[in-house]
């Protein structure tokens, strides 16, 4: 069987590709996402998609980017209502997928939105059910994100340098993501202010944090290793004797619900 597959982004295609191959299902892709804003972000996501195409050599049908199509689709809803806005957006993309599928002779369609941890499967299935009746086409359903697929997909993207976006796509989700980031940052600063008695701003989100050169280890002994969780450096270089006191091993370490690469010297 070969299906017409709407692709929302490269990371979600990674999950869908694996499940489809496991079920011996071939697919033609349709990267249709006029919701993505700004255009530079659209280009980054499309380039990531093309990178996967180069790796897996799948068929593709394309259509020009037109952000106005998304804006028109959400005119009747309150854009601040994320659930209603997203439903309209998904409907628009899935309906366009069905139209293109029929135009190209396909009788079955699906979408990588089923891979996304952000999307509600019941909403997707309800949309699909309506489109099946309206256009006389079949929808292929599979829980692409099941069985730890999201974690495995993230590892694949990291190893293969596949771009992973930080927000859903539209300008409204960009603002929402930025607001969440700001709230998280303020919360971290508030916690750190109780742990550290100096200006720690420059130590937050560092690419490389050296202990004891950048951070006096006394703070770790006084406030606990969770100080690192709130500083969130990408990589930590730590003296062996300090690491031993906290039972830290060379490589990936989990501190609370946060993971970091720690190099012991």
Where does each model-flagged region fall?
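Nucleotide-activated chemistry modules centered on ATP-dependent adenylation/adenylyltransferase
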Residues: 1-265
């Amino acid at each position: 069987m070969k299906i017409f597959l709407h692709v929302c982004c490269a990371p979600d295609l990674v999950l869908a590709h694996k499940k489809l191959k496991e079920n011996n299902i071939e697919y033609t892709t349709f990267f249709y996402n006029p919701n993505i804003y700004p255009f530079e972000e659209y280009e980054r996501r499309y380039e990531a998609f093309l990178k996967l195409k180069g790796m897996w050599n799948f068929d593709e049908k394309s259509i020009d980017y037109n952000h106005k199509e998304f804006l028109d689709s959400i005119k009747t809803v309150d854009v601040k209502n994320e659930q209603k806005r997203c439903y309209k957006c998904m409907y628009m993309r899935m309906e366009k997928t069905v139209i293109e599928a029929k135009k190209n002779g396909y009788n079955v369609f699906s979408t990588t939105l089923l891979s996304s941890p952000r999307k509600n499967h019941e909403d997707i299935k309800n949309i699909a059910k309506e489109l099946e009746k309206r256009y006389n086409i079949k929808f292929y359903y599979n829980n692409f994100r099941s069985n730890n697929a999201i974690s495995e997909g993230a590892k694949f993207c990291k190893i293969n340098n596949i771009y992973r976006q930080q927000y859903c796509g539209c300008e409204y989700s960009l603002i929402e993501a930025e607001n969440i980031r700001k709230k998280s940052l303020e919360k971290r600063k508030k916690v750190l202010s109780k742990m550290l008695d100096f200006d720690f701003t420059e130590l937050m989100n560092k690419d490389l944090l050296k202990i004891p050169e950048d951070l006096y280890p006394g703070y770790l002994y006084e406030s606990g290793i969770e100080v690192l969780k709130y500083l969130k450096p990408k990589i930590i270089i730590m003296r062996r004797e300090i690491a031993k006191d906290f039972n830290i091993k060379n490589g990936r370490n989990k501190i609370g619900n946060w993971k970091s690469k720690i190099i012991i010297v």
